[in-house]
Amino acid sequence: MGTVLEPHELQEPDGAAVEAFAGRAFGDVAGTMATVMCAVGDKLGLFTALDAGGPATAAELAARADVDERYALEWLRGLASAGYVEQAPDGRFALPPAHAAVLAREGGVMFLGGGYQELAGMLPLLGRLGEAFRHGGGIPQSAYDDDAYDGMARLTSAWFDHHLLGRWLPLLPDLEARLDAGASWADVGCGAGRAVIRLAEAYPRSTFVGYDAFPEQVERARRAAAAAGVGDRVRFETVDGAHGIPGTYDVVSTFDVVHDAADPGALVAGIRRALNDDGTYLLLEMNCADDPSANVGPLATVFYGFSLLYCMTTSLAHGGAGLGTCGCPAPVVRRLGEAAGFGSVRELPIDDVFNRFYELRV
């Protein structure tokens, strides 16, 4: 039975303030509709067809993408109204190059197609999320479909394809030299294995293993490694890092994993035990403020939304800490590291909008 609230006098709102906020809220609804249309365009290859073939009428785009012309026209008009595509007087629609970099060109640093796919895979679980609000608990990883996980991998791929090797590891030249010579690396919470595969391609003398608690993700990673041709120095296993990590390693990494963990303290302690005495733990976490009240603006809104839809709820589904996407700022990282026995917790200056990167040493 819910708490009975004491009646109180409702304040009469300022009319101008109501109108201003209503405009803002309606703008968010419009953005949601644009996101839905983008998710459809990403799934059906409409953006790539428009980008690759150039300006097109609805009939031409429908032929390129093998979709119904009437649906193509409504989609084009909808995204033209949002300013995502441009419409010419002759009835053709175009995707400007700057927009194509975000919407059509897979693998680019600014590409957002994976985010649209991930969100489309999570929204069908809103009913279960409401039940968790009412009764506690959460949504387990097994409840999410391929769109959620494939989208997640696509959204974060730029971090590993561009930043990990090109910007982040160069901040640790001694570690790069060690990897060149041959070292052992375990990535805990490896997901679809993108980071491990890129590392194996760059450092053929080193060996890499990816661990994930979710068997379906491990299978995705194995398929990706086979396709990349790095199976001779990469393996993936189903392991919950909080319950212990097999073997010892020169490097252990977690890439935006600790805030998802049911037991973050046990996870970081398990990583400490799995490190050689001269080893390095590389910890990537979301770029959030130390004070939760300072997490404001569009980026924080996206973080909290994904936290409700996945990060926090999957932890709570296992009776976990439920830190959430913004629950692992620098003070929490330092506290977890020190409690696990790390003598040095150093934040590296990666200057990244989404992430903060830490080096932990014994």
Spans of model-derived segments:
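C-terminal alpha-helical "lid/dimerization" subdomain adjacent to the S-adenosyl-L-methionine
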Residues: 284-339
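Conserved Class I S-adenosyl-L-methionine-dependent methyltransferase catalytic core
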Residues: 27-33, 37-43, 48-49, 73, ...
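N-terminal leader segment of winged-helix/HTH proteins
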Residues: 1-36
